[in-house]
């Protein structure tokens, strides 16, 4: 079956965005939506700039991610206007003129200086909802970020359009290409730095283009949840490899994690296999009407069941959860919304009018508390780790007898396990965006 082109999908996507913007502006009492792309920031006491990070609200409308000093203006009933910054500059590469599937749907004005945008922006700035950072202010056009507008737009961003799902699939394909190269580099005995370079080369993106810093962790480093140090020497012996790495496509992110054992016949490989099977079951529970908080709690029980089966804990999964022992082995949340941002916005939103759904007690790092609905894309990333400081807390809290410390000592040199896919909630069965790409030849 032929898939619609990105041009067709983008046209429908834009209709969805304008409808959302119409309602958001009405709620906030504004006439115009104005979104700056962002500005260049410089390092303290230096003339070196930081890598540019585009305003996510801007790239929701147009797939431009490296365009500081540009603007998006939308007035209900009119086509969106893109003010495109293309400076006269012989120090840097100047952006090419706008092109691609999106240009026919927008009115485009090219400017040569940031200040040239001012006469192209709405004159009555008090009638504008201006979404951006304070540094993007230009004359009287100062970001005000009205809550009524942001609450509505952020909440609705959880529901992905077919265009968004299409480009997120592209981000999956790029990341899986990198994951395959990274595993091959691991099997070849490369260092963390070498594996990272193999990943970037395969994806075709450098550290500034990737949606987040690669986590490339060998052996015990897998116990550091956000390990980003990239050792230059491979440890000996080489036991395990945890990789958490994504890719960017037209402003959208992918976020994938895999764990590998150097010895496919080891008990650690068996533990990986058990977590992998549990992760698939968790992904299959991503269904409309399911409370993500419950998925997170169920994940704790499932993982503790595995640890009990492997003789790592001595108490029931329910007891491990109730006493906090489970949090020592699985200290982060099950996952989060993903899209324009890796940790996409409004994960705690009670409604499109604001409010907050709190995390369950004892789970301070869960990033999503909403009830799942069709169109949401979430990560499912259970993990089991052997983290000294957290296991020491188990002892201090009087629960040492709940853990088989000899078994912990056997697994600790491997660091930990995390497996992460992206899953779409639909009206029926969930769609795993990640597994089919790995399964493809």
From Swiss-Prot:
Its EC number is 3.4.13.9. GO terms for cellular component: cytosol. One of its GO terms (biological process) is proteolysis. Disulfide bonds: none annotated. Binds 2 manganese ions per subunit. The gene is pepQ. This is Xaa-Pro dipeptidase. Mn(2+) 1 binds at residues 255, 336, 381, 420. It catalyses: Xaa-L-Pro dipeptide + H2O = an L-alpha-amino acid + L-proline. Its cofactor is Mn(2+). Mn(2+) 2 binds at residues 244, 255, 420. Belongs to the peptidase M24B family. Bacterial-type prolidase subfamily. Keywords: Dipeptidase, Hydrolase, Manganese, Metal-binding, Metalloprotease, Protease. Splits dipeptides with a prolyl residue in the C-terminal position. GO terms for molecular function: aminopeptidase activity; metal ion binding; metalloexopeptidase activity; phosphoric triester hydrolase activity; proline dipeptidase activity. The keyword Mitochondrion does not apply. HAMAP family: X_Pro_dipeptid.
